Curated annotation (Swiss-Prot):
UniProt entry tagged with the keyword Cytoplasm: no
Catalytic reaction(s) noted: S-(5-deoxy-D-ribos-5-yl)-L-homocysteine = (S)-4,5-dihydroxypentane-2,3-dione + L-homocysteine
Binding site for Fe cation: 57, 61, 127
Name of the protein in its database record: S-ribosylhomocysteine lyase
GO molecular function terms noted in the UniProt entry: iron ion binding; S-ribosylhomocysteine lyase activity
Signal sequence segment: none
InterPro entries, per the entry: LuxS_sf, Metalloenz_LuxS/M16, S-ribosylhomocysteinase
Similarity comment: family membership: Belongs to the LuxS family.
Gene3D superfamilies reported in the protein's UniProt record: S-ribosylhomocysteinase (LuxS) (3.30.1360.80)
Top enzyme class: lyase
Cofactor note text: Binds 1 Fe cation per subunit.
The entry's keywords: Autoinducer synthesis, Iron, Lyase, Metal-binding, Quorum sensing
Length: 160
């Protein structure tokens, strides 16, 4: 017997969201009461744009480090297959506003302060596709997203 499963992100109407934004997807509790929060960190407007793989890959590696420097509890930050943003999984209770501030600060550092030497995991030994990176593209996208402003509401522009 096949279990009926609803995947929340496929239920979201991608035509009415207004990127860039941070959206709380879900808050779940483990068997011992541990809280996990899942965020939609949408950097570009769905079905209108996407970040090319090399730039997104470099942003992914940088966010893995920069988010952890700014807030406790990060489990994982993984890119969407559609290349419009990331799932951010966190331990504990966090608000969309708190996460939007962390993302904004991280993107500001990518746009203005990061050099190639700062990008973690760019060697054959540390990355499964180490040749597919672009700091230039990561910086360009980060600045574009900052210029648009990051909202803590996916449906109306409430820029933090």
């Amino acid at each position: 017997m096949t279990k009926e499963v609803i995947v929340e992100s496929f239920e979201l109407d991608h035509t009415i969201v207004k990127a860039p934004y941070v959206r709380l997807i879900s808050e779940e509790f483990g068997p011992k009461g541990d809280r996990i929060t899942n965020f939609d960190v949408r950097l570009v407007q769905p079905n209108q744009n996407s970040i090319e793989t090399a730039g997104l890959h470099t942003i992914e590696h940088l966010l893995a480090k920069l988010i952890r420097q700014r807030i406790d509890g990060m489990i994982d930050c993984s890119p969407f297959g559609c290349r419009t943003g990331f799932h951010l999984i966190m331990w504990g209770k966090h608000s969309s506003t708190d996460i939007a501030k962390v993302i904004k600060s991280s993107l500001e550092e990518i746009a203005t302060g990061i050099t190639w030497e700062d990008v973690p995991g760019t060697t054959l030994e540390s990355c499964g596709n180490y040749k597919d990176h672009s700091l230039f593209a990561a910086k360009e996208w980060a600045q574009l997203i900052i210029d648009q402003g990051i909202s803590d509401d996916p449906f109306s522009r409430h820029v933090i």
